[in-house]
């Protein structure tokens, strides 16, 4: 009997180390970034079983077999649609400003289409303005309304949006609503899903959270886009979830959330429409390709319209596109670079690009919230401040609430506005969307908003920063080590 237990013990030890070795080899063979690989290896060797379970659940980007098959199956029809869209020559920009040209070239070659011109673009910087404008557009809708949001939380003005959406469905407008399962969990526990479905709205819970499927699909892969499409002509996107900040996370201790959204009219709605169509098909298996732009309803001349490129990321879309776009934008800066983000945990490449821009004389400013709803991100982001300050980057800490806006402005001409945070999850993992706008008029509008953020912020002083307590430094480095996983 003793021999039997000895054999079992040795087999258990052998199996344990074989499992460790197998996962280690898998991490090394994935050719991931060195900091990310080192972080996972440390977790696995310090907390072996927990680390292995965590890696198999969250360490690799896998969409799940069914969704992956749908993503693969939809590409031929999407490619044909893009080919047909290219025949609408009148909507595409043939030239861009000097600072924007490299980024637009990257997008055209990786995504297959140029930026579209002739769009009317409005920057909305308050929740009231955004939700009231959205209600007006929904009330005027005649054919279709499509929405995707990470968070939809009932309360306040959001309920007016829900009521107007249900009224639109009752009068015959085809309404589709795609909401992330994790972000919108309060919505799916409320009476609204049943009410909306009874009104005729197609409500879909995207990327359902299910502990029994954690090894079949990565659970922290989230649908983080915020898109509204109305009649294939009016569109919204930006940083704002479908929440009223007066009713959202009031107990978080960070103040009201501050966001920005872009409202668009014109052919850019078509390119946003194909992104939505891909998301809808991946989640439901149903194909809803948008119609091509109607030349009869494009009243804006090239001279007065905005040129916009849409960048989408996530499984099924060009890999590392968002990351490459940000790097290209930063390296294009010659005079000024202003970035706003609630979560600043950049890749090494992006950090070095920002520091290099400052070191070659570009006026670089980063605006982040002083208080953050994520304790881990709050400490991890501070681990980058010393290197940024030493390079000459100005860091502003926003004190008027949780600054949730995501924007980049390069030389007053090239703007990036959307859902992308400057962290690993947005850069490498989630379904995200970003608008690239080549227009000095819109750049001036964005600069005015960023100046307002700066006026409500405190500039981080380098000398005071260097005198922070030792325990702060230790905590920062601890969370910095796990930054590739945040």
From Swiss-Prot:
Stored HAMAP family: Cardiolipin_synth_ClsA
GO CC list: plasma membrane
One GO molecular-function entry: cardiolipin synthase activity
Enzyme class: transferase
Topological type in the membrane: Multi-pass membrane protein
Family designation: Belongs to the phospholipase D family. Cardiolipin synthase subfamily. ClsA sub-subfamily.
Protein's GO biological process: cardiolipin biosynthetic process
Active site: residue positions: 224, 226, 231, 404, 406, 411
Keyword rRNA-binding found: no
Residue ranges of the TM segments: 3-23, 38-58
Compartment(s) of residence: Cell inner membrane
Function, in words: Catalyzes the reversible phosphatidyl group transfer from one phosphatidylglycerol molecule to another to form cardiolipin (CL) (diphosphatidylglycerol) and glycerol.
Broad class of the protein's primary localization: membrane
Organism: Yersinia pseudotuberculosis serotype IB (strain PB1/+)
Catalytic activity: 2 a 1,2-diacyl-sn-glycero-3-phospho-(1'-sn-glycerol) = a cardiolipin + glycerol
PANTHER family associated with the record: CARDIOLIPIN SYNTHASE, PHOSPHOLIPASE D
PROSITE patterns per the UniProt record, alphabetical: PLD
EC number from the UniProt entry: 2.7.8.-
Descriptive protein name: Cardiolipin synthase A
InterPro entries cross-referenced by the UniProt entry: Cardiolipin_synthase (IPR022924), CL_synthase_A (IPR030840), CLS_N (IPR027379), PLD-like_dom (IPR025202), PLipase_D/transphosphatidylase (IPR001736)
Keywords, ordered alphabetically: Cell inner membrane, Cell membrane, Lipid biosynthesis, Lipid metabolism, Membrane, Phospholipid biosynthesis, Phospholipid metabolism, Repeat, Transferase, Transmembrane, Transmembrane helix
Pfam families in the cross-refs: PLDc_2, PLDc_N
Domain PLD phosphodiesterase, chain residue ranges per copy: 219-246, 399-426
Highest taxon of source: Bacteria
């Amino acid at each position: 009997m003793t021999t039997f237990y000895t054999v079992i013990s040795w087999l258990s030890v052998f199996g344990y180390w074989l499992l460790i070795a197998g996962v280690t080899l898998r991490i090394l063979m994935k050719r991931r970034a060195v900091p990310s690989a080192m972080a996972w290896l440390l977790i696995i060797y310090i907390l072996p079983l927990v680390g292995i379970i965590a890696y198999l659940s969250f360490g690799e980007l896998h969409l799940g077999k069914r969704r992956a098959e749908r993503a693969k199956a939809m590409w031929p029809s999407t490619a044909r649609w893009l080919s047909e869209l290219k025949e609408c020559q009148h909507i595409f920009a043939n030239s861009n400003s000097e600072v924007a040209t490299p980024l637009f070239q990257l997008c055209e070659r990786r995504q297959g289409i140029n930026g579209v011109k002739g769009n009317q673009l409005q920057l909305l910087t308050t929740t009231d303005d955004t939700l009231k404008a959205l209600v007006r557009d929904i009330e005027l809708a005649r054919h279709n309304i499509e929405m995707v949001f990470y968070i939809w939380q009932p309360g306040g003005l959001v309920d007016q949006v829900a009521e107007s959406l249900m009224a639109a469905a009752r009068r015959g407008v085809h309404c589709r609503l795609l909401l992330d399962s994790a972000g919108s969990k309060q919505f799916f526990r409320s009476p609204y899903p049943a009410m909306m479905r009874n009104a005729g709205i197609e409500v879909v819970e995207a990327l359902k959270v299910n502990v029994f499927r954690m090894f079949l699909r990565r659970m922290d892969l989230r649908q983080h886009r915020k898109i509204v499409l109305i009649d294939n002509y009016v569109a919204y996107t930006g940083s704002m979830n479908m929440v009223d900040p007066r009713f959202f996370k009031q107990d978080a201790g960070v103040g009201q959330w501050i966001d920005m959204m872009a409202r668009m009219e014109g052919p850019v709605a078509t390119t946003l429409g194909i992104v939505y169509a891909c998301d809808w098909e991946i989640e439901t298996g149903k194909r809803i390709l948008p119609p091509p732009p109607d030349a009869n309803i494009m009243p804006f001349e090239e001279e007065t319209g905005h040129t916009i490129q849409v960048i989408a990321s996530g499984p099924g879309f060009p890999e590392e596109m968002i990351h490459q776009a940000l790097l290209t934008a930063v390296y294009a800066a010659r005079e000024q670079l202003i970035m706003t983000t609630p979560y600043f945990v950049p890749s090494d490449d992006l950090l070095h690009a920002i520091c290099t821009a400052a070191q070659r004389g570009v006026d670089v400013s980063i605006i982040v919230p002083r208080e953050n709803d994520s304790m881990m991100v709050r400490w991890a982001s501070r681990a980058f401040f010393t290197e940024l300050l030493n390079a000459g980057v100005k860091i502003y800490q926003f004190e008027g609430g949780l600054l949730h806006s995501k924007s980049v402005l390069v030389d007053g001409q090239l703007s990036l506005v959307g859902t992308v945070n400057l962290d690993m999850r947005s850069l490498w993992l989630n379904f995200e969307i970003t608008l690239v706008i080549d227009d000095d008029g819109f750049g001036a509008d964005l600069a005015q908003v960023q100046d307002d953020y700066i006026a409500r912020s405190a500039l981080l002083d380098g000398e005071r920063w260097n005198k922070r307590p030792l325990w702060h430094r230790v905590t920062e480095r601890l969370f910095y080590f796990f930054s590739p996983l945040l």
